[in-house]
Amino acid sequence: LYELINQFLDELQYMEQRFDTVKHEQEEDSFYSIVLPYAEHIDALIADLKTYQNVITQKVNYFNESKFSLLISNLQDLSVECHFARTSRKLFNEKLKAVRYDLNQIKRNGECND
């Protein structure tokens, strides 16, 4: 789980960089050649994360089922939104911050070091 969380944190960094590039250039990525494969990559990581759902919701303080679902939803949203210039910077950054906080909370408090 620890490695998976680190992988998600790396992906968040990529999403943030991709979003900044797309916003700066005002040129959106191709949906079928870039966005869809990347979203599928993130979905595969999410499927791995879901196998740890019970461990996370039981071991991490204040991390219940609804917070876990919101984390998943935000990860899915960010994986697509980072490729589009029309995405609101404020909303994107709020989701990014929330996801980064949640992942770090799992990493710190989860006692899940494989």
Predicted regions and their residues:
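Residue-level recognition of alpha-helical structural elements
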Residues: L1, E27, F31, V60, ...
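Short, flexible helix-adjacent loops and helix caps
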Residues: D20-E27, N54-Q58, V80-T87, E111
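Short terminal alpha-helical segments
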Residues: L1-Y32, L96, L103
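Short, solvent-exposed, charged loop/turn and helix-capping segments
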Residues: L45-N64
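Short, well-ordered alpha-helical segments
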Residues: F63-N74
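Amphipathic alpha-helical binding modules
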Residues: S73-D114
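A loop-to-helix transmembrane entry motif
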Residues: S30-E40
